[in-house]
Amino acid sequence: MKVPPCFPSLPDADILCIEVISIEKGMSSTDQAAQVYQLRIWIRHISPQIWRRLLVRSDSTIAQLHDILQIAFGWRDEHLHRFLIRGKPYGIARSGGMSFDDNPHQVQLRDFHFRSKETLVYEYDLTDWWQHEIRLEQVLPLDPTKRYPLCVAGKRRGPLEDCGGPRAFMDLQDEYPLYKVLPQFAQMLLDHRDDLDDCQGELRRLAYWIVREDFDRRAVNRRLVEYSAGQTGEKGSSHAYSDTGDH
């Protein structure tokens, strides 16, 4: 390589180093190859644990991760939320709620360069205060035969919305054991068989405690597919993203 006149004293190796550094500094996050983050998420202060294992693209934004978690745990996105990442809050600003320094539709997960086993927190409903702990279990290569995001494991249904938070939820678990709920549910169906519309709310509440141990991973993945295809209006469809392949 011929040494340019502006660097008369630099050897060829130093020039190459300068060129590489310049290229790396000029790379944006969109220039980096996407990977897959395997995340394990659980709700704090709940026993038995309610948890999910998700595969999420590293180029997912904070806003997209919010939507994904809402779907994975069955939340309705009716309350304020925030992420706490290394002590700094992130999230989608809402009228009358918190404001954030960074645009959640632009900040990508890979921008943080998370280490394996590193954790962050997702808080939802700042009155009931559901705290979801998120741990990066491992970083995987992108599989072109799979569609992301993808739920690969989990246990138990997400809590009832507006039930009062973890402590109240634990008390309700004791208050509604299956052997009590099943007769109540059956009796209500009999008593209101001609006007079930009048007791839909109570029936749904009782039904939750009947099936609370069940987790329908396939149903979650169907919703995630709809979300990634931009078909789910209630959970961030304007920020949807997808990958090729089926699961």
Mark where each language-model region is:
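Short linear regulatory motifs enriched in tryptophan with gly/pro/ser
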Residues: 7, 11-247
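Extreme N-terminal basic, low-complexity initiation segments
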Residues: 2-6
